[in-house]
Amino acid sequence: MSLPLRHALENVTSVDRILEDLLVRFIINCPNEDLSSVERELFHFEEASWFYTDFIKLMNPTLPSLKIKSFAQLIIKLCPLVWKWDIRVDEALQQFSKYKKSIPVRGAAIFNENLSKILLVQGTESDSWSFPRGKISKDENDIDCCIREVKEEIGFDLTDYIDDNQFIERNIQGKNYKIFLISGVSEVFNFKPQVRNEIDKIEWFDFKKISKTMYKSNIKYYLINSMMRPLSMWLRHQRQIKNEDQLKSYAEEQLKLLLGITKEEQIDPGRELLNMLHTAVQANSNNNAVSNGQVPSSQELQHLKEQSGEHNQQKDQQSSFSSQQQPSIFPSLSEPFANNKNVIPPTMPMANVFMSNPQLFATMNGQPFAPFPFMLPLTNNSNSANPIPTPVPPNFNAPPNPMAFGVPNMHNLSGPAVSQPFSLPPAPLPRDSGYSSSSPGQLLDILNSKKPDSNVQSSKKPKLKILQRGTDLNSIKQNNNDETAHSNSQALLDLLKKPTSSQKIHASKPDTSFLPNDSVSGIQDAEYEDFESSSDEEVETARDERNSLNVDIGVNVMPSEKDSRRSQKEKPRNDASKTNLNASAESNSVEWGPGKSSPSTQSKQNSSVGMQNKYRQEIHIGDSDAYEVFESSSDEEDGKKLEELEQTQDNSKLISQDILKENNFQDGEVPHRDMPTESNKSINETVGLSSTTNTVKKVPKVKILKRGETFASLANDKKAFDSSSNVSSSKDLLQMLRNPISSTVSSNQQSPKSQHLSGDEEIMMMLKRNSVSKPQNSEENASTSSINDANASELLGMLKQKEKDITAPKQPYNVDSYSQKNSAKGLLNILKKNDSTGYPRTEGGPSSEMSTSMKRNDATNNQELDKNSTELLNYLKPKPLNDGYENISNKDSSHELLNILHGNKNSSAFNNNVYATDGYSLASDNNENSSNKLLNMLQNRSSAINEPNFDVRSNGTSGSNELLSILHRK
């Protein structure tokens, strides 16, 4: 039989018995690790007290209500063994209370659907209202803790409402509170706590009312006051997205984020291509089914109708520009598939495509890759079934032609956007020459035909062309002589420089240092004849060669003198690029005279010609040689030479601007090259800049011996020339003034002492010789020589006075005391004339710098200076052949002489063409000014000046060295 069992704690009135039961249930039998610390043991004491409150007190209402403090003291008194700590219970409970405050709390702020009310709870042991919340357990995350605590306190599951990104977190009194924001909870839900004796009340509160009466009403709130501001902001944001459009966009964004779709959707090209191929295969299978006699279904017929409609639309679009299409690249491929639009033609290797039709180069806007080495010249065969059209060279300037390829149209694919096609202008090659990508002659002709001739001044000016084999340069030169034009300033510079340039006839011969003296005398005789027979047209041809952008310049031909003179025009540039880049800009600007291009452009062109002439042989240039010349003077080499020139020019401050400071002499120092052959050395250094050989690199340079020179002196001059890095520009000016006189004096009449003159003595002699009129006999020469001695001293005094006036500008300069003695003072006044002539200045050569140093005085003396300069011109010039022309340019004679000394780079001021005929000049234009008169005077000086046994050394003065020093300091 069984004994009926009664409830253990039912009708029990003894508190000790109840505590013994709870002691066995919650404390004695707990794991040892839970008794390892005071806090963990007190957690079990707390659970036992909750059990007493929740269950035993309900069964026996007469039992006393016990708090955790009194309940713990009773348990320890009943069983002291459970408390093994050396601490009092009340102190342990205080530590436990502090520990509980450090445990994080997770809860939820629950709003209704209208976001107007919030759900709050009130605890059984508290009189304040707060969010449903609870302490986080061991190894529990925030979301799970929030869901668990809310479900225990109000009985509502937040799993479908909670968002881990929307929460408010605060630290209050060292305790972390994290409240998740929940919206959309229905107010009709029956909230009921799941735990006993923990939650007393659950109510909805108006949020706006709470925010206004939080600190005024008697109702107490906990955590709400510290979180009111972020709650209000969150509600405002939630109300804004409540609108229908915003909700839709918000839902769409959330859906995209959920599906992993970004805002910028990337189209997969592989998938699109696969879909296109599937569509084409499906359409092909449908056509095969129809051709096999199978009756398609109604759906297939509808699909075919839609495709045919799309085909018609595409045909209409293509018919609008079909007339502008290029001929098919694949004529043999596209014709068999013209009737069947859905069949893709077989592929063809690219090599065969390029070999079968060379138009592929033109239609693909140039070569897509390197040309095939196995390509053969194609010839048109009219007997073939598909004749190959005329080859078209590549058009590099044409845009790409999308309609060039005759690929069959795949109508079942998605129709691409049709753009306006570009037509290619046909450029057929000659029929007798097969198309070949390796023909340098054809490529050079094509490039030369497209280059604009921007430097051509008149339509009659001949173009430079590359000579073919068998072509004589003499025939071309004779045709060009009648058509060339030349300005007066260029003719003047050519007349001054011609004796120097005429020494280059034997440039292609071996070094003359190994020749006897008789050979040297013969060479100089040929120089004199060449100077007398030179024409102005050759200077214009040289200017065309300098300004031309084409590279076919300077064909060296040995047999004739005219051909040698043509080659002489390029030799100075070759030497300038080989020896000294710094002197290149100055010597070239002096030698070649005025030009429209800037100094840097001139130097670049001269350097490019010099680089070209290094690799050129003295033979007729054919097609292949012309192609090599074209390759050797590319733009890259021009750019490199220009950079080297600019870097070298930067080393000296004014070396490209001031020709008189080339040797960098100190103030007051006189150039001291007084060796017995310094005159020849000075002249040969200037000649060396413009008369070196035009041969292949590493070939010895050619020197022309002067009369009286020895091989030993030439060797010394060569060493001195190699060691000198900067050529004296003042000696270049001396050479310009010396050449017209030295070329007219015969070798039998020249004194041997003239071979040993220094540069300063010769420039003084030149300035004195310019004031000598046309001599009639030796007596006039003697009287003129005495006058020149006085004029030289006056010239030195005037230049010294001008030097003082420059350094002290406040002191007045008086020229009246010198203005009435002789005509040489006109030249001195011109040298001091102020820069008020009206001629435009050109900053590109040494001549402009010399004119700047000569024109710095007051403009109040202009009338008297003009009178003196006119007298000087009348005194210097012989009577010309034609006195009928007048000065139309309204410029006085001082302007004209100053512009001639300046170099007169403004070519627009001179429009006359001067043709040299037997030493005399003919002026054919009415616009000729006084510079033409001076030009005629200088040209006629060869027949006008005849001074036998003239000793230059007798006219040298001690002040000439000081004159040259003053010129150097300027």
From Swiss-Prot:
Q: Which residues bind Mn(2+)?
A: 149, 153
Q: What does changing residue 835 to N do?
A: In strain: YJM280 and YJM320
Q: Where is this motif: Nudix box?
A: 134-155
Q: Reaction catalysed?
A: a 5'-end (N(7)-methyl 5'-triphosphoguanosine)-ribonucleoside in mRNA + H2O = N(7)-methyl-GDP + a 5'-end phospho-ribonucleoside in mRNA + 2 H(+)
What outcome is documented for mutating residue 522 to D in this protein?
In strain: YJM269, YJM270, YJM326 and YJM1129
GO CC entries:
cytoplasm; cytoplasmic side of membrane; nucleus; P-body; RNA decapping complex
List the InterPro entries.
DCP2_BoxA, DCP2_BoxA_sf, Dcp2_NUDIX, NUDIX_hydrolase-like_dom_sf, NUDIX_hydrolase_CS, NUDIX_hydrolase_dom
Outcome of swapping residue 577 to N: In strain: V1-09, YJM269, YJM270, YJM280, YJM320, YJM326, YJM339 and YJM1129
The protein's required cofactors: Mn(2+)
> What PROSITE patterns does UniProt report for this protein, alphabetically?
NUDIX (PS51462), NUDIX_BOX (PS00893)
Which effect does the record note for changing residue 60 to D?
In DCP2-7; impairs mRNA decay at 37 degrees Celsius
**Nudix hydrolase domain location:** 101-228
Q: What's the effect of swapping residue 951 to E?
A: In strain: V1-09
Q: Which UniProt keywords apply?
A: Cytoplasm, Hydrolase, Manganese, Metal-binding, mRNA processing, Nonsense-mediated mRNA decay, Phosphoprotein, RNA-binding
Q: Tell me which EC number(s) this protein carries.
A: 3.6.1.62
Residues bearing PTM Phosphoserine: 116, 439, 679, 682, 751, 771, 773, 778
Polar residues: which segments have biased composition?
A: 577-590, 677-691, 848-863
GO MF annotation list: 5'-(N(7)-methylguanosine 5'-triphospho)-[mRNA] hydrolase activity; chromatin binding; hydrolase activity; manganese ion binding; mRNA binding
The entry's localization annotation reads:
Cytoplasm, P-body
Q: What is the effect of changing residue 866 to A?
A: In strain: YJM627
Instruction: Give a GO biological-process term.
Output: nuclear-transcribed mRNA catabolic process, nonsense-mediated decay
The entry's function note states: Catalytic component of the decapping complex necessary for the degradation of mRNAs, both in normal mRNA turnover and in nonsense-mediated mRNA decay. Removes the 7-methyl guanine cap structure from mRNA molecules, yielding a 5'-phosphorylated mRNA fragment and 7m-GDP. Decapping is the major pathway of mRNA degradation in yeast and occurs through deadenylation, decapping and subsequent 5' to 3' exonucleolytic decay of the transcript body. Blocks autophagy in nutrient-rich conditions by repressing the expression of ATG-related genes through degradation of their transcripts.
Q: How does it assemble?
A: Component of the decapping complex composed of DCP1 and DCP2. Interacts with mRNA, LSM2, LSM4 and LSM8. Interacts with EDC3.
Family classification: Belongs to the Nudix hydrolase family. DCP2 subfamily.
The entry's protein name is: m7GpppN-mRNA hydrolase
What is the native source organism of this protein? Saccharomyces cerevisiae (strain ATCC 204508 / S288c) (Baker's yeast)
